[in-house]
Swiss-Prot record:
<feature type="transmembrane region" description="Helical">
    <location>
        <begin position="10"/>
        <end position="30"/>
    </location>
</feature>
<feature type="transmembrane region" description="Helical">
    <location>
        <begin position="288"/>
        <end position="308"/>
    </location>
</feature>
<dbReference type="Pfam" id="PF07670">
    <property type="entry name" value="Gate"/>
</dbReference>
<comment type="similarity">
    <text>To M.jannaschii MJ0871, MJ1556 and MJ1589.</text>
</comment>
<keyword id="KW-0812">Transmembrane</keyword>
<keyword id="KW-1133">Transmembrane helix</keyword>
<keyword id="KW-1003">Cell membrane</keyword>
<feature type="transmembrane region" description="Helical">
    <location>
        <begin position="251"/>
        <end position="271"/>
    </location>
</feature>
<dbReference type="InterPro" id="IPR038880">
    <property type="entry name" value="MJ0871-like"/>
</dbReference>
<dbReference type="GO" id="GO:0005886">
    <property type="term" value="C:plasma membrane"/>
</dbReference>
<dbReference type="InterPro" id="IPR011642">
    <property type="entry name" value="Gate_dom"/>
</dbReference>
<keyword id="KW-0472">Membrane</keyword>
<feature type="transmembrane region" description="Helical">
    <location>
        <begin position="115"/>
        <end position="135"/>
    </location>
</feature>
<feature type="transmembrane region" description="Helical">
    <location>
        <begin position="178"/>
        <end position="198"/>
    </location>
</feature>
<feature type="transmembrane region" description="Helical">
    <location>
        <begin position="91"/>
        <end position="111"/>
    </location>
</feature>
<feature type="transmembrane region" description="Helical">
    <location>
        <begin position="219"/>
        <end position="239"/>
    </location>
</feature>
<protein>
    <recommendedName>
        <fullName>Uncharacterized protein MJ0880</fullName>
    </recommendedName>
</protein>
Amino acid sequence: MDILPYLTKIILLSSIGITIASIIVETNLISKIKKITKPICLISNLPEECVVSLLGNFINPTVGKSMLSGFYKENKVNEKEVIVTTIISPLPTILGESVFRVQLPLAVVILGYKLGLIYVSLNVISGFLQALIGILYANIFFERRQINIDNNNNEKIVFNREVIIKGFKKSLKILKKVIPMIVIFTLLINFLIKLGLMDVVKGLFSPIFRILDLPGEAITVLIANLAHFSAGYTTVDILIKNGVLNEKQALIVLLIGNIISVTMIYLKHSIGTYISLFGRFGLKLAVINYTISVMIKILLILLLIAFF
């Protein structure tokens, strides 16, 4: 594979995708998508404060956590309600911050429409399954309550020069993180393939990966994913183009990489955030949310192995 034309194409398309996504966010179009999460919030049988914090997660997970913490400290919600809200919270985060703003455009551009859409869909399904667990628990064990939320959305879609400039500036912040990772890992993986070190990697990890029907070289995707998910996408695409991975294997290794990324995020950021907002109770929240998230991803991997 000729690396320079490939790298140029990926950088160009990634830049266009991220920029367009950032501009779309600034037009207020994303606010219309909140209607996707509202029905789920309304049937969750949670108090209005929990629903409001869930909608905050659509904007940013830190916003949602901070709002929920405030309601908890004011005794407006109890521990069980906070736990269930935390379990449901990844869904609006996935739909809002992860998928529509960054993950979807990058996955489609780098992995292609078919593989990119399937992988992003698996992430969305993961969020829905986790939310379903929380919703079922709340409806079975919580007393039925009446929830009233204003569903009228008066925000208008705006598209002008100011919106374009603002979206472009936000895209630059994202691209400053994404582009270097794509370049570094594209060159690194290409170098390893040419050097033959992939054979060494294959020998070291083939026993474990054989169980999952993965080649030993797939470990490079996991390593790249530790730096940034876009680097993981790029590595997968390179391995597919070099005949190392097929689509099924690519999806499995991407989900494994997702588990590793989630683990690192929790170790680096989430646990500290939960504890700082909720005290000792925050550690319990982090452990519960992480455990359910990983278990669902493992389930999806097993389903891929069995049926894809």
